[in-house]
UniProtKB/Swiss-Prot annotation:
Highest classification ranks of the organism: Bacteria, Pseudomonadati, Campylobacterota, Epsilonproteobacteria, Campylobacterales
Residues the record lists as binding substrate: 55-58, 115, 120-122, 126
UniProt domain comment: Possesses an unusual extended V-shaped dimeric structure with each monomer consisting of three distinct domains arranged along a curved 'spinal' alpha-helix. The N-terminal catalytic domain specifically recognizes the glutamate moiety of the substrate. The second domain is the NADPH-binding domain, and the third C-terminal domain is responsible for dimerization.
Gene (UniProt): hemA
UniProt source species: Helicobacter hepaticus (strain ATCC 51449 / 3B1)
Binding-site residues for NADP(+), renumbered to this chain: 199-204
Top-level lineage group: Bacteria
Pathway(s): Porphyrin-containing compound metabolism; protoporphyrin-IX biosynthesis; 5-aminolevulinate from L-glutamyl-tRNA(Glu): step 1/2
Record carries keyword NADP: yes
PANTHER family: GLUTAMYL-TRNA REDUCTASE 1, CHLOROPLASTIC
Additional remarks: During catalysis, the active site Cys acts as a nucleophile attacking the alpha-carbonyl group of tRNA-bound glutamate with the formation of a thioester intermediate between enzyme and glutamate, and the concomitant release of tRNA(Glu). The thioester intermediate is finally reduced by direct hydride transfer from NADPH, to form the product GSA.
Biological role stated in the UniProt entry: Catalyzes the NADPH-dependent reduction of glutamyl-tRNA(Glu) to glutamate 1-semialdehyde (GSA).
SUPFAM superfamilies given in the database record: Glutamyl tRNA-reductase catalytic, N-terminal domain, Glutamyl tRNA-reductase dimerization domain, NAD(P)-binding Rossmann-fold domains
Subunit structure: Homodimer.
Annotated protein name in UniProt: Glutamyl-tRNA reductase
Amino acid sequence: MQEKMEVQYMVVSFSHKNVDIATREKLSFSQEEIVPFLQEINVCDSIRESILLCTCNRVELYVSMIDKKRAREHIYECFCTHKNIALEDIKNIALMRLNQYAIYHIFSVASSLDSLVIGETQITGQLKLAYKLAFENALCAKDMTRLMHFAFKCAASVRKETDISAHSVSVASTAVRMAEQKLALCDKTLENLPVLVIGSGEMGRLACKHLQNANAQITLVSRTKENARKLALELDSSINIESWEHLEQLLGQYEVLFSATSAPNCIIQSKMVQVSQKQRWWFDLALPRDIENIQMENLHIFCVDDLEEIVQEHKNAREDSAKKAQKILERYSVEFFKWLQTLGIDPIIKHIRYLAKQSALKELDRAVKKGFLPASYQQNVEKILHGAFNTFLHQPTIRLKQASENPQGDPIIEAMKNVFDISDDVVMLNGYKCEKDTIF
C-alpha cells in the first residue's frame, strides 16, 4: 500500500496587526501579479494548493502542503523575489500559523473578527474573490475548496448568531465617522459639505454610501468615468461626476477627501497640492496608498492605520458579540478537522449509496416494464426503497466513519474498496464533493 501523506494547512500573514502600512505597501500585489506569484508558489512539490488574499489591511497566503519546512522556505523566497525584500526581513515580519491555528485564523478572517473594523462584511466578499481567482486558474482544488466552504459557512453563522455585523460597518464608514469628529472640532458637519471621493470600486462605493447618509454633497472622480456614472446611478443620488483629467484642479476645492483607487502608485503628489488657509482632512483608504506623504500646513492626511482610535471604540462596543463569535469559530474549527478525518471513508460511502441507488432503480424499472408493478406506483415505491436503503445503510455508515477516525482504520477502508470494486479515481472524484449524497 502506498504511504499516505497527510495534508497540512499553513497561513503566512502580513496584516495590520503585525506590519505597518509602509511595509504592507511594499508587499501588496496588483490583480495582475497574483496568478504568476501563486504559480511560482505551487512549483514547490511540498505545496499542493494556494490562495493569496490582498486587502488594505492584509497580505496573506493560504496553502495546503505536506512538508512545512520546505513549504515555508519556498514561500519566504517567493515573497523575497517578487517584492525585492531581503529574506531575513521577510522572515522577521511574517506571521506563520499551522494547521488548527491556520484554520482558526482563516475562519476569523472570513468572519471579520480579525479585521481592523470588527464586523465589517467586505472581507467575506474579498476572500471569495481571492478563492475564485485561484480556483479558476487551477491554483487550488479540493483542499482549499473544502476549507473555504467551511470558512464561508462559519462567517454566515457568526452573522446569524451574533449582532457583530449590525449597523453596517467598514473601513469606509469608520473613516467617515472620523471625518465627522475632526469637523466637529471646527464646529462643522458633513451635512451639505462638498466632499471629494476618488475611486469607484467597493471602498469608494461604501464611502459614497455613508457620506450620502450624512447628507454630504458628493463629487466622484474615477479613472473610468462610466464606472463613476454606474455607481451614481446605483446609489440613486445627486452625486456629481467629474473627469479624471480635472483631479489636480479639484484638490484645491475640498476640505474633506476620500481616496480609494487600485492604482499601483500615488495619484496625489505634493506638486499637485497648493497651500490653503482652510483646514483639510484627507483620508487615504487605498493600499498601496493613493496620497503621497505631504507635509503642508492645515493639511491632515490619514491612512487606514490612523483609524485605530475610532476602531477601538467600536471594538469595545462589540466585545460581547466578539466573544460569542469566537465560540462559533472554535466550534467550526473542531468540526472541520473532524470532517477531514472522515474524508477517507466518505467517498466510499457515497459510492456504496450510489451503487445501491442504481441497483434499486434498475430493478424497479424492470418490474414496471414487465408489468409486475403499475407505473402509477413507481414514485411511491422509489420513496419506500429510499427509506429502506437509508435504514439499512445507517448503522454501517456510522461504523465506517468511526473506523476512519481511528489510525488503524486504513485496512478497513482498503477492504471496503476491494469488496465493492471502488477505484482510487472514484474515491478522488467523490472526495471533491463537500455535501453528503443521498440515495434519491
